Structures are given as structure tokens and as C-alpha cells.
Design a protein with these regions (language model features):
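Boundary/linker segments flanking structured domains
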Residues: 1-46, 51-145
Length: 145
């Protein structure tokens, strides 16, 4: 069996969704983002997204009707892939797919029941990851035949 490749994602401090588009990281960063809501002392992950452009550009087009259906504070975390150093759109897609499959957010339509990926990865979520698991091993997603 080939050796797994390591991906490290550094998650930003959570920011209010409405103000997140104006943060410095939203202008510079790209990768994965996590939209959650906090209510009654609990946090619920609602959506995982990706962008190979700036976070800000993606969030500007992301105001979803469903967000107004939730009480409480809507927050976003930005996940910057710090390892490997060179990040491709294929890696970003594989990371998004693995996270969606692993946590099954309510408002993601695809990749919740299965997905394909380019390489065999193990993901390490670091920083302010909130409810995101610390480690996601893609090998655990493979259904035995």
C-alpha cells in the first residue's frame, strides 16, 4: 500500500460571517472554509466550502437563503493549507471532499455519501478548528468491497 501524503490545514479564529469578508485573511488566503452557527452554547457546522481564489471573493457570492433560517451567530473559519507548500486545485478539492464526507454538514449537497479523490491523504486540522475533527484519514472513508 502506498504511503499516505500529509495535509495540514491551519484554521483561523472564527469570525462573524457578515464581517469575515473584510478581514485581512479574506483578502490574502484561499483554501477551505467552514460556516457554522452558535446558539444556546452549541456550535453546529452547516457548510464546508472551497476556493482556489481569495476567500473574500467566494464569500461575497455565498449569502445563502438558508442562513437566515438559523437563530444565533453565524460564523466562518478560514482553513489555509500549510502543508504541502504547493497547493493545487486538486488538493483543495480532495480536502473539501474528505471533510464533507467525514462530518456530513446539512447544507452541502454533494460529497456527503461518497466521493473520489486523487491521492491517499491524512488531514491534520490545526488552530481554531472548532467542531472539526483533529485528524481525518481518507483510508477510513474507503468502503470495503
Amino acid at each position: 500500500m502506498p504511503k499516505q501524503k500529509t495535509i495540514t490545514i491551519k484554521w483561523s479564529y472564527p469570525r462573524e460571517f457578515e464581517n469575515a469578508k473584510e478581514t485581512e485573511l479574506s483578502y490574502e488566503g484561499y483554501g477551505i472554509y467552514c460556516i457554522s452557527r452558535k446558539f444556546g452554547g452549541n456550535e453546529t457546522i452547516l457548510y464546508i466550502g472551497k476556493t482556489d481564489k481569495r476567500f473574500r471573493d467566494r464569500l461575497k457570492n455565498h449569502k445563502k437563503d438558508w442562513m437566515s433560517n438559523y437563530r444565533g451567530e453565524k460564523i466562518v473559519r478560514f482553513g489555509t493549507i500549510t502543508k504541502p507548500v504547493t497547493v493545487t486545485s486538486t488538493i483543495i478539492n480532495d480536502v473539501e471532499s474528505a471533510i464533507i464526507y467525514d462530518i456530513d454538514p446539512k447544507h452541502n449537497k454533494s460529497k456527503r455519501k461518497g466521493y473520489s479523490y486523487f491521492e491517499d491523504y491524512i488531514l491534520y486540522n490545526q488552530g481554531y478548528r472548532g467542531k472539526l475533527p483533529k485528524i481525518i484519514d481518507i483510508r477510513n472513508h474507503i468502503n470495503p468491497v
